[in-house]
Amino acid sequence: MKLSRKAKRYDDSVLPGEFQGFEVFHRVDAELEGTLEGFLRRSQDGVQLGEVVLERHAPKKLSFAKLKNKAEALSEQVNYLKERLEIVDHDRRGMYIQLRSLPPYKDDTQIQFNEISIGKNKIVVKRIAFYRKEEVKQQVPLQLSERELERLLFDIRQAIA
């Protein structure tokens, strides 16, 4: 997925999370001609999702208008996370759209938000925390129920199909 310069600088400034104990998963999706991969940890409280990446290996012709429509539809569909998603960045030439939680979760020490990056053939889902005192952005787990995880995987698959 080709990122805009602004998005690339932003992604480079997000530190990787501490995901020891998370299980890595990798699934081939023959119908979609792609792969689903990421890492998560299951517990009695549900699922902690580190990151999920759905990539289509067979390139699909897609205009930016269609990509934007898919992003808008995804932001409406994914209404079961704690914060609603809105488009915050896009790059027409690079065929890239970024959705983020608005308003994000805030407390005295941090700001947290969900982020879904949508490219022509790839979708990345993660949660990011900005720690105010250290002024550091770091990836953190996204807390979901099993049902929310299955629905999220279904919704992102529909967006890239």
What is the meaning of each model-derived region?
Residues 10, 17, 71, 103-106, ...:
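Residue-level detector of solvent-exposed, low-hydrophobicity positions
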Residues 1-78:
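Charge-rich, low-complexity N-terminal segments
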Residues 48-115:
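The feature represents the first ordered module of a protein
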Residues 11-12, 29, 45, 89-91, ...:
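Acidic-enriched, low-complexity/disordered segments with a strong bias for Aspartate over Glutamate
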Residues 35-40, 111-125, 152-153:
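Short, structured motif recognition centered on aromatic/hydrophobic residues
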Residues 30, 101-106, 127-132:
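Short acidic, glycine-rich loop/turn motifs
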Residues 122-161:
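Mixed-charge, glycine-accented linear interaction segment located at domain edges/termini
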Residues 108, 117, 140-144:
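Short, well-structured alpha-helical patches and their helix-loop capping segments
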